[in-house]
Amino acid sequence: MTTKKLYFLSISIIILVAISIAIYITLNSNTKTRLTNDSQQQIDKIIEHDLQKGHIPGASILIVKNGKVFLNKGYGYQDVDKKVKASPTTKYEIASNTKAFTGLAILKLAQEGRLNLNDDVSKHVPHFKMNYNGQNETITIKQLLAQTSGIPSDITSEDAVTNKNNRLNDVTRAIMGDELHHKPGEEFEYSNMNYDLLGLIIQNVTKQSYTKYITNSWLKPLHMTHTSFKQTNNKSKHDAIGYELQGSTPVVSKPEFNLWDTPSAYMMTSTEDLEHWIKFQLNPPDKYKSLVQQSHKNLSSTIGEPNANAYASGWFTNNDEHLVFHSGTLDNFSSFILLNPKQNYGIVVLANLNSEYVPKLVEHLNTQIVNHKRYSTVASILNQYKDQFNIVTVLMTTLILLAFIFSAYRAWQMRHGQILLRRSKRIAVLSWLTLCLCIAIALILYALPYLILGSNNWSFVLTWLPIEIKLALITTLIALFSTLIVILLFLHTKITKT
C-alpha cells in the first residue's frame, strides 16, 4: 500500500470512529429520570475538583429535583483547625441570597394591602429623600426591588458609614440627601442599600424588627428552625468559620460588619434548612403560588450582567434557560442558589470562602442535571469497557514508542547523509493537506464533549472520567499526531541510493 493510501485510510478511520461514537451515544441516551449511582460519583468528582481548584476549605451542597433531595452533603471542613467536617447542618453566611427573603416579604405585605409597590419610600420612611442633579427625587418601593432607584452601589462605603451608624435607621438617615447615580426607574444599578431600605420599610409597616418579622412569617412556617441572622463574630457549634485566601492558603477571617446590612446580606443558614426554601420556591402551596411566581417576574433589565437578562424581587433571571438565581459574596463566605422552575430542580452551594469557583461549580452541577441522561449513558458505556480502554492505552503507547524510534532513526539517517529531503509541488500540497487534516481532527476532538454530551468542554468532562479512559484518550491523541509525523517523514524524505 502506498504512503498516500495509508495516510487517507488512517484519517478516514479516525473520523468515522469519532462520528460513530457520537451517534451511538446520542441515540441510546435513554436512562432513568433520577440521577444514577454513576451520576452521584460524577457529581462528587465535579464538586471535589472545583473545591480543590478554588482552595475552598468547606462547602455544603444541596440538589433538589421533582420535590426530592438528590444530594445534601458537606465537603471539606467547616473549621479547618479543629477538623470539624462540613455537613448539611453547617451554617454559613449566605450574603445576598438574603435578598430573596426580603423581596418576598415586601410582596406579601403588598398582597395584604399594608403597602403598595408604587408607594414613595418616604411614605414609610419619614423624612427620607435623595437628590438627582441637585433636585429631590421620588423613589418607589418597586424601584428598590428592581434595583433601579439610582442609589449608588458604593453609597455605604466605609468612608460614609461609621461604627456609630450601625443600625438600619441610623445609616438610612446618614445617606439622606445624597446624590443618586441616575434618575430613579431609568437604569439598573445593584446596591445593597435598596434592600436595606426595604428591610426598614418592613420594620416600619409591621411594627416589628426585620429579623423578628422574617423569622415569624417565613422561617418558622417553612420549618427553617436553625436559620438566624448574624449579630456577632462569635461562633456557635454549627457555624462555619469564614476564610480568606493568602496566596493559595485559606486563613481565618473575621471582618467587621454592620447590622444595618442584615436585610441584604446577613442571614445565616444551612442546606438542611434551605431544602425547605427550595421546595417552597419550586412547588409553593396554593395560597403562596402567585406570590412566589410574582417574585420571579422580571422587574428590570440587567444589561451587562453575566448570564442574566433581568432582576426580579431579590433574584436574577435568565429567560432563555428559564433560570432564577442569585450569588452571594462576603469577604469570607460565598453562596449561590439556582432554580429552574420549568424543569423543577434547584441547586444550592454554600462555602466558607469567597471564591469564583462557587458560581463555576453551580454551572457545572446545572449542566450535569440538565444532561444527566446523556452523562449516565456515557458513564455506563465507558465503565463497561475499562479493560478494553487499558488495552487501547497499551497499544497506543506501543505505537508512540515505535513512532519515536522511527523518527529518531530517520533523524540519525539524515545526520549521516543516508536520506535526502524531497521537494516538489506534490509534496507541498500533501503537506498542506496534512496540516489541514490535523487541524480538522483537533477540532473534532475538541468538540467531542459537545457532540456526545450536548455541552461543556474537556476540562469539565475530565473531572469525572475514570482514569482508564483519561489515559486511553491521552495516549490516543499522542499516537495520532505521532503517526502523522511519521507520515510526514515518509512524504518528505527518501533513502539515498548507494
From Swiss-Prot:
The keyword Cytoplasm does not apply. It is a multi-pass membrane protein. The keyword Ribonucleoprotein does not apply. SUPFAM superfamilies: beta-lactamase/transpeptidase-like. Keywords: Cell membrane, Membrane, Transmembrane, Transmembrane helix. Gene3D superfamilies: DD-peptidase/beta-lactamase superfamily (3.40.710.10). It is found in: Cell membrane. One of its GO terms (cellular component) is plasma membrane. The chain crosses the membrane at residues 6-26, 389-409, 433-453, 471-491. Has two of three conserved motifs typically found in penicillin-binding proteins (PBPs) and beta-lactamases, but no penicillin-binding activity has been detected. Its precise function is unknown. Has no penicillin-binding activity and is not involved in methicillin resistance. This is Protein flp. The lineage of its organism: Bacteria, Bacillati, Bacillota, Bacilli, Bacillales. The gene is flp.
